Amino acid sequence: MSIFKLMVIYFTLFWVVNAAQLLDLDSHGVIPGAYIVVMKNGVSSHQFSSHVRWLKRAHRRNLAKRVAPFTEGLSSTWDIAGWQAYSGSFDKDTIQEILNHENVEFVEPNREMKAASTIKQENITWGLARISHMENFSHDYVSTYGEGENLTFYGIDSGIDIHQSDFTGRARWGINVADHIDIDCIGHGTHTAGTVAGQSFGILKKASIVSVKVLDCYGHGDTTKYINGLNWAINDAKKRGLLGKSVMNISLGTGRSRAVNEATVRAQEAGIFISVAAGNNAINAEFLSPGSAPELCTVAASTRNDTRAYFSNYGALIDLFAPGEYIRSTLPHNRTGIMSGTSMAAPHVCGIGGLIMAAEGLAPEQVCRRLKELANPAIKYAGFNTTDKLLYNGSGA
């Protein structure tokens, strides 16, 4: 049964004379009247604070000067490793003033964000064996880089069942920016977390696990909620001294978004290795975010026979393939289940990336390059202009 599907949203760039860029989209997936505003590089914290005060005054003034539908105004502000932005609902006059402000780089609509996978109840598991052997059809998992001791995994997803016994007491609830239901209703986040850090199905078997819920019980979110979750995770890691010792998996996406790409890249630069799913639309990954950001490790899905899964996105932005078809992992309430998708492939890279980062003392932005050096050139029928590199953990097996 299909749970959710990545949306493909094409957008057109409009120019405003002597103003910031307005990145516009077609109506599909756009949340009417809701926007993300990104500041120019080099804007100071003081200038950002002054801009926010100006914005609040402009919003009140424009609402008061005529009869107009109410808009709530500012909802969130972010500073992710110097990337400063905010979101909110604004009327057209306020948006025009924002575009004309000297410190604004661009504005884009807030839009829906979803994850992608299918679930099948079948008794099969093979992913860990494949990524720890150069030859296919092995049946054991071999690792020479440990089990993720002293690492922390942040799952940006539908939430994680922190009481799942396979997490052996290592999981904690971080934040819920999606709804008011502090559980993983759909299982997607618990499944991806199990591949990264579960005892039975995971790679970082001794890592700490943190749930960051950005998708609601229908598997829906938006770019504002996503960036809110990302921002919280960076601040949590900084507060706890975990930067440089943390990994993050992002098995969700939306149409190509400059704001989503920039925020995610800055999060990695702050000190967290990030693995992202390429998407399940069987199209070029350049059309989706955050997988279209070349600085991130974008992961396509492979099959048991070392081919590209029929649903997986492809193209020059793919860094690695990893097992993504019929992957068994954890589900809420101490259950297990099989899911397929690039959502299932990316967690394999997240886990191995954490091991390599810790073992070799790499910066997060160096990890993907190292994984590609270790990778196994095994993928057949990868797709046009797409790598043949399959994730390998360097075990020597």
UniProtKB/Swiss-Prot annotation:
Alphabetical list of Gene3D superfamilies matching this protein: Peptidase S8 propeptide/proteinase inhibitor I9 (3.30.70.80), Peptidase S8/S53 domain (3.40.50.200)
Residue ranges of every copy of the Peptidase S8 domain listed in the record: 125-397
Domain of life the protein comes from: Eukaryota
Cited SUPFAM superfamilies: Protease propeptides/inhibitors, Subtilisin-like
InterPro entries xref list: PCSK9_ProteinaseK-like, Peptidase_S8/S53_dom, Peptidase_S8/S53_dom_sf, Peptidase_S8_Ser-AS, Peptidase_S8_subtilisin-like, Peptidase_S8_subtilisin-rel, S8pro/Inhibitor_I9, S8pro/Inhibitor_I9_sf
Active site: 157 (charge relay system), 188 (charge relay system), 343 (charge relay system)
One cellular component (GO) term of this entry: extracellular region
Residues covered by the Inhibitor I9 domain: 35-115
GO molecular function, one term: serine-type endopeptidase activity
Principal subcellular localization: secreted
Glycosylation sites per record: 123, 136, 150, 249, 305, 334, 385, 393
Enzyme Commission designation: 3.4.21.-
Keywords attached to this entry: Glycoprotein, Hydrolase, Protease, Secreted, Serine protease, Signal, Virulence, Zymogen
Subcellular location field: Secreted
Positions annotated as propeptide: 20-116
Family: Belongs to the peptidase S8 family.
PANTHER family membership: CEREVISIN-RELATED (PTHR43806:SF11), PEPTIDASE S8 (PTHR43806)
Function: Secreted subtilisin-like serine protease with keratinolytic activity that contributes to pathogenicity.
Protein name from the UniProt record: Subtilisin-like protease 12
